[in-house]
Amino acid sequence: MKKTDNPSTNSSANSSKVMKTKSHPFWQWFWLTFLVVSLAYAWYSFYVPSNDVVWADNMVSAQELADDSGKNMLLFFTGEWCVPCRIMKREVFADKEVMKAINSQVVPVMINIDDPYAEELVKHYKIGTTPITIFTDPQGKVLDYAVGKIGKTKFLKMLENLGATGS
């Protein structure tokens, strides 16, 4: 006599085999490593160290301070969503040499282009992308600028050139 298989019994036996199957250790380590690396990258992307640059609150107070001190202004146009801006804040503005140079030579203003109060400045300086670094005289006349992410060396060179030609 031939034994017939009952499909309902067979499928439950197969499903219990599937449930008991463990994944290969390689994949466990792969996914764990992937998760750790992803978390580290996410933290690094959003981490901006504190710095000692004394950023002006607004353009009016910055112009008054620049006028009184005889310094030029640094306008840094940024956005909350701007990854190159965060990299500049972390790698350029948090550098001790850069902080010292900024605080001694210019009046810095950080301008978030998404802020409704910055709309007039964004239009005036024709800002279409970020980051943009602009050096101006106290009246707001552009002396030098850079579009996009710049490194410490280029930033310091711009500041040096500004000192040689500026007031």
Positions of predicted regions on the chain:
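Thiol-based oxidoreductase modules, predominantly thioredoxin-like and allied folds used
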Residues: 55-56, 93-117
